[in-house]
Design a protein with these regions (language model features):
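Active-site His/acidic residue clusters
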Residues: 259-275, 325-327
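Non-catalytic accessory regions flanking glycosidase/transglycosidase catalytic cores in CAZymes
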Residues: 28-240, 245-257, 283-284, 288-321, ...
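Bacterial Sec-dependent N-terminal signal peptides
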Residues: 1-35
Length: 506
């Protein structure tokens, strides 16, 4: 906890539209003389709380062009000697990605880790997504990627596999001695990989699964009590099964939460800007719901207070498109209908989809995590690369989508403590729905002198006039700022115009 000293008015960071530094401002348009007004008041008598930077994490699944043709492309002239796209690595390093969850996702339900290690790898059928998995990107390639990004590796087990297969993977990754440690050494990696965070399955439920979580968690903790264990907790509009806390709670460090607010799985849609903004406060209510369920388990004594945190390890405004899938049996790869369905997935790569809606929604999501940082200690945008992710990768280069810049601003400009604030302003309406025009987060450094404030202006056509106060006093002194905005709500970046939407100094 950090208390504010009396000389707190020296510096200010502002974020307007979509920008951060002294002020980070995220906004739709700045070419309008009309404005809306708001007042942000920092509660100077309350403590500022440290947040976990793992909320700026990412997720990669063996789907589409996230791995192959994304971060990993050995045949490309843009790749290094190990097959990693250097332009992608450089861009992701701008985001200081703190943690990456891998290999899925639904893909993991059919993944057996042993197929992705060693020199004798063979392609296997990816039944879930109806393609052939080459297995050239496996455990060691994932660890290498994490090293290139200085990111914490977070591995998700096959939730349909036997517990022993999970334990074998942990031993292969982390053990000093034993059968699987010896296998790792034979494969050319004498030192343990030191993977500390493991998830027991992806989006599984039911008593049989929960019992597996209990058994796997118990066995993993026996290997190393410092391992952090998570499992499927809540996805979509489901709720956490109370039996999970009762049966497996003592072995858990995280509950996994997943949500995509525009579900494009089967039918693809591109709602307009206002429709997207009407969704921008839903992450907060979703997070509060999960917190309340955890608190109920704490009150009942099923888990210790503060023991289990939330890993929001799949989230995005938009889900990616996969009509006709996922499946549970091998498909005929030569079937024209199957080929057509798989090709249809590429609509998620269309640059024009990712406009200011994605940038501002992402800022609102991150603000929700920051405001609830006592419980939300990890979040992973899904995916990090291609499909609906912030970085588009094509054979000749990359495009930083609008929400790439949201992440870049937040990770580089925010300070390390979150303050409690009050926001007074008007509402933005769309039919019967409404949200606040302004969303904001205020952060402060360890000294208590330097502030960084992110301000999101959701209004599609009006500028924002915003007062920032510390208690009863207006903040003053030196400040700098960056703004992320565009010519219109539909502004986007593409190959020909990669900087239509990019932060600007103000």
């Amino acid at each position: 906890m950090k208390r504010y000293p009396k000389y707190y008015l020296n510096f200010l960071t502002i974020i307007v539209g979509v920008s951060l530094t002294s002020y980070l401002f995220l906004s739709c348009t700045t070419k309008n003389n009309s404005s809306v007004k708001a007042t942000i008041t920092i509660n100077k008598d309350e403590n500022a709380e440290a947040y976990n930077p793992m909320i700026f994490g990412g997720f990669l699944e063996h789907f589409g062009k996230q791995i192959y043709g994304g971060v990993f492309d050995p045949g490309s002239t843009l790749s290094n000697e190990k097959g990693f796209r250097t332009d992608v690595i450089d861009a992701l390093n701008e985001l200081k990605v703190p943690i990456i969850r891998w290999p899925g996702g639904c893909f993991v339900d059919g993944y057996h880790w042993i197929n992705g290690v060693g020199d004798s790898r063979k392609p296997t059928d990816d039944v879930r997504w109806g393609v052939i998995e080459p297995n050239t990107f496996g455990t060691h390639e994932f660890i290498e990627l994490c090293k290139l990004l200085d990111a914490e590796p977070y591995i998700c087990h096959n939730g349909l596999a036997e517990v022993q297969e999970m334990i074998d993977w942990v031993e292969y990754s982390n053990a000093e001695i034993g059968k699987f440690a010896d296998m790792r050494k034979v494969n050319g990696f004498p030192e343990p990989l030191n993977v500390k965070i493991w998830s027991v399955g992806n989006e599984r439920s039911g008593k049989e699964y929960i019992n597996k979580v209990r058994d796997a968690g118990m066995e993993m903790k026996k290997i190393d009590s410092s391992l952090l264990v998570t499992c499927s907790g809540i996805h979509g509009n489901s709720s956490i099964d109370p039996y999970l806390f009762e049966a497996a709670g003592e072995y858990l460090d995280y509950i996994s939460a997943h949500q995509y607010w525009i579900e494009n799985w089967q039918e693809h849609s591109t709602p307009d800007y206002l429709s997207c903004m009407m969704l921008s406060e839903k992450p907060e209510s979703y997070i509060k719901n999960v917190i309340n369920q955890i608190k109920t388990a704490e009150t009942k004594g099923q888990i210790d207070k503060g023991q289990i945190k939330i890993a929001f390890d799949e989230w995005n405004l938009r889900s990616w498109h996969h009509p006709g899938f996922q499946r549970f049996e091998k498909v005929d790869y030569n079937d024209p209908e199957i080929i057509k369905l798989i090709e249809a997935r590429d609509i998620s790569l269309e640059p024009s989809i990712y406009n200011l809606s994605d940038a501002l929604f992402s800022a609102s999501f991150l603000n929700s995590c920051l405001r609830n940082s006592e419980y939300v200690t990890m979040a992973n945008i899904a995916p990090l690369v291609n499909q609906t992710g912030p970085l588009y990768v094509h054979p000749d280069g990359i495009v930083k989508r609008t929400h790439f810049h949201t992440f870049e601003m937040y990770v580089n400009d925010l300070e390390e403590y979150v303050s409690n604030i009050d926001i007074k302003g008007s509402k933005l309406t769309d039919g019967k729905d409404s949200v606040s025009v302004v969303d904001a987060i205020a952060t402060v450094d360890k000294s208590g002198k330097k502030w960084a404030i992110s301000i999101v202006n959701r209004h599609p056509s009006k500028n924002l006039t915003c007062k920032v106060k510390m208690g009863d006093d207006l903040l003053n002194g030196k400040f700098k700022g960056r703004i992320l905005t565009g010519e219109s709500t539909e502004s986007y970046n593409d190959i020909d115009y990669p900087n239509r939407v990019a932060p600007k100094e103000v």
